[in-house]
Every structure is written in structure tokens, then in C-alpha cells.
């Protein structure tokens, strides 16, 4: 169990009540991954929702540029101290939509996906809070992706003429 005072430090949990934080703390475990370690790939079963205590993680997708060519890893986001990742743990079909690769030694607070979903079903108010926080994460990631896409489209348009 992680101390509630530590959970309060994360933006993901900032709107949670004291009781909700206690419930989250009861599920929380600590986890560490070394620099260079792949945590998961796109399509893997989403086993946990993570909060980054320390370190840096690249969220990436693979882009296939043609047959016979190796896939290109495209960075979608970089997750650092205080941020969250692994929202797929609470959103069907419960598979990660991006890969995760630690670029620093990284310490996490992890919430087991099955236990977390059971808690969300049991406590609807907590489930609502979690989904609000997840929605913010998805919205931010979508905004970052749009900016990247617009930048690439803008460059391709400029170079075509």
C-alpha cells in the first residue's frame, strides 16, 4: 500500500476525495523498470494503470513504410515524473494502444487493472473520478498527436509545391 500523501502529489488524482485516495492507495504497488527496458507493446493486455514517480518513458507506435522495410518507431508522447500512462487498463478492450519504453530508470505506482475495474464497479463515484482523469489524459494525448500530424502535413504540403 502506498501512502495517501504520495498519491496526492499526482495531477491524475488531484480531484479525488480523501476516501477515494485511501481506496486507490489500497490497490497501489511500487514497480521499477530500467533504462532501455520495453514495458509493453501496442496490443498487449493492459495489466496496469501507472503513475510515474521518477524517470522518463517514451510512448511510441510503429509506422510501416512498406513491405520488406523495418517499422519506424514514432514517438507519440514522453511521460515524466508526476504523469500517468496506461489508461487502457480501464477502457475496453483493455489493450495498450501504444508501446512504452523507459529511457531512464523509472519508478512507478501501479494499479492492477482487474482490481481497479472491480473497485470502479463497486464505487461508482470513484469510477467516475477515474474516468474523468483518464479522459483528460486521452484529450491531452490527442492534442499532442494532432500537433504532430499538422506539423507533418504542413511540411509535406510545403515540400510538394
Named regions from a protein language model:
Residues 1-161:
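Cytosolic regulatory regions built on CNB/CRP/Popeye-like sensor folds
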Amino acid at each position: 500500500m502506498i501512502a495517501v500523501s504520495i498519491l496526492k502529489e499526482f495531477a491524475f488524482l488531484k480531484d479525488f476525495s480523501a476516501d477515494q485516495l485511501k481506496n486507490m492507495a489500497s490497490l497501489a504497488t511500487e514497480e521499477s523498470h530500467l533504462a532501455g527496458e520495453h514495458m509493453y507493446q501496442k496490443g498487449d493486455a493492459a495489466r496496469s494503470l501507472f503513475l510515474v514517480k521518477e524517470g522518463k518513458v517514451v510512448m511510441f507506435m510503429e509506422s510501416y513504410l512498406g513491405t520488406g522495410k523495418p517499422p519506424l518507431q514514432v514517438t507519440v508522447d514522453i511521460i515524466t515524473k508526476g504523469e500517468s500512462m496506461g489508461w487502457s487498463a480501464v477502457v475496453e478492450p483493455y489493450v495498450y494502444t501504444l508501446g512504452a519504453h523507459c529511457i531512464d530508470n523509472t519508478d512507478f505506482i501501479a494499479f492492477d487493472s482487474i482490481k481497479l475495474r472491480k473497485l470502479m464497479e463497486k464505487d461508482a463515484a470513484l469510477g467516475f473520478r477515474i474516468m474523468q482523469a483518464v479522459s483528460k489524459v486521452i484529450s491531452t494525448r490527442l492534442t499532442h498527436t494532432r500537433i504532430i500530424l499538422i506539423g507533418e502535413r504542413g511540411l509535406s504540403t510545403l515540400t510538394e509545391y
